[in-house]
Swiss-Prot record:
Residues 160-162 are annotated as: G5. Monomer. One of its GO terms (cellular component) is plasma membrane. This is GTPase Era. Belongs to the TRAFAC class TrmE-Era-EngA-EngB-Septin-like GTPase superfamily. Era GTPase family. Gene3D superfamilies: 3.30.300.20, P-loop containing nucleotide triphosphate hydrolases. Pfam families: KH_2, MMR_HSR1. One of its GO terms (molecular function) is small ribosomal subunit rRNA binding. Residues 13-181 form the Era-type G domain. Its main location: cytoplasm. InterPro entries: G_ERA_dom (IPR030388), GTP-bd (IPR006073), GTPase_Era-like (IPR005662), KH_dom-like_a/b (IPR015946), KH_dom_type_2 (IPR004044), KH_sf_prok-type (IPR009019), P-loop_NTPase (IPR027417), Small_GTP-bd (IPR005225). Disulfide bonds: none annotated. It is a peripheral membrane protein.
């Protein structure tokens, strides 16, 4: 009888690693630093990430498939909020390792909500305590680390800085040790499961999130209507959907200056990501109530609700 592991190359490990935590705790920044390039969009605003996205890192015999998730949060009235919470919760199922990202000192109700879900997973858990580079006296961190260990006794606690990369080598080593023996799921040069169209839409949305600040209308999504390479130029037409005329005016800005700036910043990142000259055109359209319309959300790529 042939052993099921006989076909697995010696030393080969591969598995899924869910990165979970409350909104705006540094999950996407962590993924980007691990991958060594910008893949997941980031901003200072909560709920920037709306979809699960795979970030794939292959180093020698180890392939870690990281799942970047929306932050679990309490505001769940609209269909979009329910979608994000379900998406984040679903990531805890059928993964091989969970990285629970928390802030170095701040603990919220939403952190507690994530903790209560993580306590019931059957796979290994790593607690990544983020932003520890901002603490002058490391001894001040110890009570928080001890408390976290009490909450998840089987978990390994790792102080990190997602922004500066501090201790990420330690975190990745712990992940690799916990991955099962397996053939790799993806080609060595593949870094994500998401399409180029999806990544382009996310870059536009990121620039909107960063530009608008306190004016930010959260009822924004981006559709890519055209994505076509013609010679050396990649032509991208993106439609920005909002829910009200007032939001449309905010995005366009005075004499179109804001949408021009959004487009310029998005185009720069796209040219790096796609290694091509990019011609980006943006339009803004009002689609009332889309963020609370399950049918509209499905048509916009938000999956099952």
């Amino acid at each position: 009888m042939t052993d099921m592991h006989d076909d697995i190359p010696a030393g080969s490990r591969c598995g899924y690693v869910a990165i979970v935590g409350r909104p705006n705790v540094g999950k996407s920044t962590l993924l980007n630093h691990i991958l060594g390039q910008k893949l997941a969009i980031t901003s200072r605003k909560p709920q920037t990430t709306r979809h699960n996205m795979l970030g794939i890192k292959t180093e020698g015999e180890v392939q870690a498939v990281y799942v970047d998730t929306p932050g679990l949060h309490k505001s769940g009235e609209k269909a979009l909020n329910r979608y994000m919470n379900r998406t984040a919760s679903a990531a805890l199922k059928d993964v091989d390792v969970v990285i629970f990202v928390v802030d170095r000192t701040r603990w919220t109700e939403e952190d507690q909500m994530v903790l209560e879900r993580v306590q019931y997973v059957s796979c290994p858990v790593l607690i990544a305590v983020n932003k520890t580079d901002r603490i002058e006296e490391k001894a001040d961190l110890l009570p928080h680390l001890e408390w976290l260990t009490q909450q998840l006794p089987k978990a390994e606690v790792v102080p990190i800085s997602a922004q500066h990369g501090t201790n990420l080598d330690v975190l990745e080593k712990l992940v690799a040790e916990r991955l099962p023996e397996s053939e790799h799921f993806f080609p060595e040069d593949q870094i994500t499961d998401r399409s180029s169209r999806f990544l382009a839409a996310e870059l536009v949305r990121e620039k909107i999130m960063r530009q608008l600040g306190a004016e930010l209308p959260y009822q924004i999504t981006v559709e890519i209507e055209e994505f076509k390479q013609e010679g050396r130029i990649l032509h991208i037409h993106a439609l920005i959907l909002v829910e009200r005329e007032g939001q449309k005016k905010i995005i366009i800005g005075d004499k179109g200056e804001r949408i021009k700036s959004i487009g310029q910043n998005a185009r720069k990142d796209m040219e790096v990501l796609f290694d091509s000259k990019v011609m980006l055109n943006l339009w803004v359209k009002v689609k009332g109530g889309w963020s609370d319309d399950e049918r509209a959300l499905r048509s916009l790529g938000y999956g099952d609700l």
